[in-house]
């Protein structure tokens, strides 16, 4: 592969996962870039999620269809690969072949055959835990690390360029995950006040993550790099909880649950879930995540690509809360 930068004026890009949470955020920004955009959708009906001003070419195919992938990758410079399992609870350690690994293997083969220059892979900070064997080690993170390895191997063979973006937990309207669950439970009045927690976590806004993806697509500096993407802030779970109550216009209760109660409730919920007695995302892992630091540094992507996060959870939180209070508005 040549090493000069991809022409940033009007690159030809393919977006997978365009109808997902991050994909929709990206597609809202792409019209301003005026790129030649194509999206790969598994379901034609999901094209309703795309902004009309995107004016994208739509290919309907599955990531397991080599014929569809070859068509999607034809005459593309860059693939922005956002498709895949988005949440820890969706991944089982018992799956023999990770579908995300199979998908990226198929995508790399098609992209290489069609002379695609670069793949930008949206991964997760949980891949870092799997890689270092420190922190929150999950089957999900192991799977993301395996996906990264497939892409890196192809890049090392000279088939294409690879850029990997490891996102921390993402916030924004339409978000899912633990913070969204916490907001919903507070709205319903089913979550008692948490213990006073001193741990800090990194987060990133969906729009900032979309901007990082755009920057990574055409930067010569990004070639072969793996970046962690955060908004640069260190958030306290207790401060987030207080901000949720404020966004709801509610008074924060004057008492807090003892830490042991939180641990026991999380462990019991996890046991019920494993026994099939109750479905839910709460487990002893929830307790660990609520009580341990989970901080990441974004200095590399800021320094290399000039990434400059604009959003902050507390500024976006009222809109997120409103969307969960009135989800159909």
What are these model-derived regions, one by one?
Residues 56-102, 110, 125-134:
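NAD(P)H-binding glycine-rich loop region in Rossmannoid oxidoreductase-like domains
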Residues 219-281, 298, 304, 311-314, ...:
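Mid/C-terminal beta-alpha module of Rossmann-like enzyme folds, strongest
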Residues 128-129, 163-181:
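Flexible, glycine-rich beta-alpha linker
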């Amino acid at each position: 592969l040549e090493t000069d930068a991809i022409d940033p004026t009007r690159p030809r890009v393919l977006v997978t996962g365009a109808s997902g949470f991050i994909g929709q955020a990206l597609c809202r920004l792409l019209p301003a870039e005026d790129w030649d955009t194509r999206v790969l959708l598994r379901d034609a009906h999901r094209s309703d999620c795309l902004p009309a001003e995107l004016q994208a070419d739509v290919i309907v195919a599955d990531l397991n269809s080599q014929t569809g992938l070859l068509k999607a990758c034809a005459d593309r410079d860059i693939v922005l690969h956002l498709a895949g399992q988005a949440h820890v609870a969706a991944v089982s350690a018992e799956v023999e072949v990770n579908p995300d690994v199979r998908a990226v293997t198929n995508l790399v083969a098609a992209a290489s055959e069609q002379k695609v220059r670069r793949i930008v892979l949206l991964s997760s900070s949980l891949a870092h835990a799997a890689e270092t064997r420190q922190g929150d080690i999950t089957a999900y993170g192991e799977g993301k690390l395996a996906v990264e390895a497939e892409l890196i191997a192809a890049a090392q063979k000279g088939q294409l360029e690879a850029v990997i973006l490891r996102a921390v937990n993402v916030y924004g309207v339409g978000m899912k995950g633990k913070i969204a669950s916490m907001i919903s439970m507070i709205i319903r009045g089913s979550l008692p006040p948490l213990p006073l927690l001193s741990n800090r976590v990194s987060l990133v806004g969906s729009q900032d993550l979309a901007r990082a993806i755009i920057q990574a697509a055409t930067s010569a500096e990004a070639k072969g790099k793996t970046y962690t993407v955060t908004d640069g802030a260190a958030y306290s779970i207790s401060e987030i909880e207080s901000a949720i109550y404020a966004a709801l216009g509610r008074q924060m209760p004057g008492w807090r649950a003892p830490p042991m109660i939180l641990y026991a409730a999380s462990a019991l919920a996890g046991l019920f879930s494993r026994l099939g007695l109750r479905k839910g995302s709460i487990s002893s892992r929830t307790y660990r995540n609520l009580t341990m630091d989970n901080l990441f540094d974004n200095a590399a992507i800021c320094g290399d690509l000039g990434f400059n996060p604009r959003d902050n959870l507390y500024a976006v939180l009222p809109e997120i809360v409103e969307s969960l209070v009135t989800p159909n508005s």
